[in-house]
Amino acid sequence: MKLQCVSLWLLGTILILCSVDNHGLRRCLISTDMHHIEESFQEIKRAIQAKDTFPNVTILSTLETLQIIKPLDVCCVTKNLLAFYVDRVFKDHQEPNPKILRKISSIANSFLYMQKTLRQCQEQRQCHCRQEATNATRVIHDNYDQLEVHAAAIKSLGELDVFLAWINKNHEVMFSA
C-alpha cells in the first residue's frame, strides 16, 4: 500500500513538473559566448556613448519595459529584440572607425546566431508571443522612431549592455567555443 501511494505521489509530481510553464522550464537555450559579446561591447562602449547627443533619452527604458517581462514572454521578447538590433540598429548605424565596425559586426554575427537558435525553438513551439511581449517590443520600436535614425542607432548601440544583462538574467545560456 505504501509503495503504491509513493508511486502515485511520484507520478503526480512528475506530471505537475512537466506541465508547469514557469521561470526555469521550457525556456530556450541560447548557445553562444555571451562573455565574448560583452567584451566586444565594452571595448567600444565609451566611443559609441560619446556620440550620443541625447543622454537623457532611453530606447530600451530598462525599468519600464524589460523589467516587467514575464518568464513566459522572455523568448518572444528576446527574439524580437534580436531582430530589432539586426534589422534596424546595426543596419542604420554607419561607423567610420574600422575597429569599432569590426566589433559591431562581431556582435551582429553573434545576434544572427542567437536568432537561428530561437527560430529553432519557435519551430518546436517553445517560443510563444503573447500580447504583452508584442506591446513591450512595440514600445522599444516607438522610442527608436522618435529619434532621427542615426541618433536612434547610436542610442540603441550605447544601451546594448542593458539588453545583454537582461539576456544573461533571463535565459539559460550555454557557452559555445
Swiss-Prot record:
Summarize the record's induction comment. by DNA damage through pathways mediated by JUN and cGAS-STING leading to production of the cytokines IL1, IL6, and IL8.
**InterPro entries given for it?**
4_helix_cytokine-like_core, IL-10/19/20/24/26, IL-10_CS, IL-19
Q: Provide this UniProt record's keywords sorted from A to Z.
A: Apoptosis, Cytokine, Disulfide bond, Glycoprotein, Secreted, Signal
Q: Name one GO cellular component term.
A: extracellular region
Taxonomic superkingdom: Eukaryota
Disulphide linkage map: 28-121, 75-127, 76-129
Disulfide bond recorded as keyword:
yes
Q: Name where it mostly resides.
A: secreted
Sugar attachment sites are 56, 135
Instruction: Look up the signal peptide feature and give its range.
Output: 1-24
A Gene Ontology annotation in the biological process aspect, one of them, is:
reactive oxygen species metabolic process
Task: Please report a single Pfam family linked to this protein.
Answer: IL10
User: Could you tell me one molecular function GO term of this UniProt entry?
Assistant: cytokine activity
Which compartment or compartments is the protein found in? Answer: Secreted
The family annotation for this protein states: Belongs to the IL-10 family.
Q: What does this protein do?
A: Cytokine that functions as an anti-inflammatory and proangiogenic factor. Polarizes adaptive immunity to an anti-inflammatory phenotype through induction of T-helper 2 responses by both down-regulation of IFN-gamma and up-regulation of IL4 and IL13. Produced by osteocytes, stimulates granulopoiesis and neutrophil formation. Exerts its biological effect through a receptor complex consisting of a heterodimer of IL20RA and IL20RB. In turn, activates the Janus kinase (JAK) and signal transducer and activator of transcription (STAT) pathway, and importantly, STAT3.
Q: Which PANTHER family match?
A: INTERLEUKIN-19, INTERLEUKIN-19-RELATED
Name the chain's protein. Answer: Interleukin-19
Q: What organism is listed for this UniProt entry? A: Homo sapiens (Human)
